[in-house]
Amino acid sequence: MAPGITSIDPSSLKGLLAEHQDICTLELTAVTGLEEVAAEECQEKLGVNCVIARGRVFIDIHVQQVPEVFKLRSIDNVNVILQMVTNFSFPDNREQCFQQLYKFAEKPDWRKGMSVWKNVFSFSEEPIQEVKALNNDYCKPRPDIDLKRMKLTSQIIDNIPEGILPQHLKKKWQPEEEQTNAEINSIVTDTTVESEEDSSEKQRVQASGPKFRISCNRTGTNHNFGSSEAARQFGGAVNEMFGWPVDLSCFELEILLYIDTEFVYVGVCLTREPLFKRNLTNFGRTNLRSTICYNMVRLAAPQPGEVIVDPLCGGATIPMEGSLTYSKVLHLGGDNFGQAVKRSRDNIDYLVKKGKSMPIDVAQWDAARLPLRNQCVDIIVSDLPFGKRIGSKGDNRVLYYNSLLEMARITRTGTGRAVLLTHDRNSMMRNIKRVHTLWKSATSRTINIGGLSAVIYILHRTALLFDPNLKIASKTHKKPSEPGTMWPEYLAARPPLST
């Protein structure tokens, strides 16, 4: 697993040094567990050195080369880093913390970062027209507004003085249902009045330039302030220095403030939306991120002339990403659900209309009875059902077993390989052991998908030929007609497949 963000040495990043004005430091966010794959792509396509942290890859690149970064297929977001501090000591006094965050806005190299942002988004005006000195005073704290979304489970509630906690946080041990309607209405009314006062103060300040907002991500248990409070102080200083208008919803510029214990860095977001949404027009319930799809295909190391199949393709995100990158490889996908096949065709047609030429095709089939010849496929890349939104773990035990056998039948012996993603580790490991004569487990990677801990398994096909009459014995054998049978004998009632 990649090291944490606090292990990074800012001196190793040239883009953060004042003497390198033509080089900038970019933060490329990646799926946790696939940072090394993203770094390999950066080194291969950009020729840059990478510094890996958990969920991130930092690179130094020439300012003129920044547009090339958006062509990478393994990253989700791109941010330009302006300042990074490893020992940002926060005092115990809240007001001193606010003062520190307020003055910290003077430290970043705003001109370099905003120059990169302007070129990426083709902003017509000069973002920084005048820089005003700060008044050396932090903004008025508004804990009743900034902390109203803090949950009772937050780890820093005990660090905040009880006198300034909002009403819903003071009643830490009282169930939320026990609050009276009058109490709830008073909280809403007070918040509304203060929000109107806050907005009237903003209207009195004449602002020009890009509309911006501050997004603060804070990690740690030793802080005595919330993320919104830190964003208010830092954003107030930015507004005071440059006179940019604040807009939390229809913003043009998003400034990122990351706080991890005493590790703090500031960045500017260079992506309007995550890059994993760029190739899909028809989304399903379980669409896999296109960046994960690319990484899985890359792990399979396809060679020109090979055939890649996804027997449970869903919206065809894996075949699409593979065909866009590996154009000399044939990509096939299929699913048992008719609506999924329709979504697949819609997504493919959308890319074809954009002028993309892709060696890809999709069909409706059963993953346990594929209409393909023996040993006609080189690689299997598939996102198996997790058993969460679709199916169940009980179904997975049977589906995984039958699918692994069918995959073994259609893949080439000795050279075939499979890259399979699943959240149901127990079912997968149990079935890999049952088909160990056909599949050899090479390695696995644990990744984070929306808070779920999933695993990518890389399997290699053994040299053993697939026998249609082969029966893999299980430890506990039950007849298929018995209730509770979880391991029916494969191919027992199935006619032999012709080659």
Predicted segments, located by residue:
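Short, charged/polar, Gly/Pro-enriched secondary-structure boundary elements
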Residues: Q64-L72, E273-F276, L465-D467
